[in-house]
Amino acid sequence: SSKLSVHEIITLSSIVELEGAKAADRKAVAGVFYNRLDSNLYPTLGSDATTYYASKIDDWSYSLTYKELNDCNNKYNTRCSSNTGLPIGPICNPSIDSIVNITILLIN
């Protein structure tokens, strides 16, 4: 994961944007998801934000159903064992802060 394309950086940054509720949290969130890209312990990203996006749900108080959590045909669902790595594209327009946090990880 040390060499991500611009598309992959924006995609990962968009996950960080929605998973990190506050800007102060996004550095840690970026580290977690970046490390999961190369982890044998975490074969998938397991992002709630991508699973909600995959199910076209924008109400985070909604509890995802078993069917939604296990819809592996949707390439945005990063909880499925068949959907490893990043989803097929961004799930939102990430802030500069989220992009910078991912870029710093790539540089270090």
Each language-model region and where it sits:
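Bacterial extracytoplasmic/cell-wall-associated proteins, especially those involved in peptidoglycan
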Residues: 1-108
